Amino acid sequence: MTNRLTLSGTVCRAPLRKVSPSGIPHCQFVLEHRSVQEEAGFHRQAWCQMPVIVSGHENQAITHSITVGSRITVQGFISCHKAKNGLSKMVLHAEQIELIDSGD
């Protein structure tokens, strides 16, 4: 089964870093996406806020460059996580992160 997602946007919630009891580093943040997409010949506004988690040592270095307002592209897979309130939420598990040059 295929499960791949590429999403570009702006980091809208500060990264939160934790280390699991087994020593695996995790970085969590929220990515906000806004764009205009074409569907059935019409333009529509697309918007979402997607929680992102970066796990393992491989991608942790780039997470130290990520702050609120950073523009990035994230590639990975999606999965549901059960929140503390018991509700499920979709989470993007990042496997590749690219900083988008702001052109400044």
UniProtKB/Swiss-Prot annotation:
Coiled coil location: none
UniProt xrefs under PROSITE patterns: SSB (PS50935)
Matches recorded under Gene3D superfamilies: Nucleic acid-binding proteins
Domain SSB: 1-101
Keyword tags: DNA replication, DNA-binding, Primosome
Cellular component annotations (GO), alphabetically ordered: primosome complex
UniProt entry tagged with the keyword DNA-binding: yes
GO BP, sorted A to Z: DNA replication, synthesis of primer
Keyword hit for DNA-binding: yes
Top-level taxon in the UniProt lineage: Bacteria
Entry GO MF terms: single-stranded DNA binding
Annotated NCBIfam families: PriB_gamma
Role: Involved in the restart of stalled replication forks, which reloads the replicative helicase on sites other than the origin of replication; the PriA-PriB pathway is the major replication restart pathway. During primosome assembly it facilitates complex formation between PriA and DnaT on DNA; stabilizes PriA on DNA. Stimulates the DNA unwinding activity of PriA helicase.
Record note on quaternary structure: Homodimer. Interacts with PriA and DnaT. Component of the replication restart primosome. Primosome assembly occurs via a 'hand-off' mechanism. PriA binds to replication forks, subsequently PriB then DnaT bind; DnaT then displaces ssDNA to generate the helicase loading substrate.
Sequence similarity: Belongs to the PriB family.
Protein name: Replication restart protein PriB
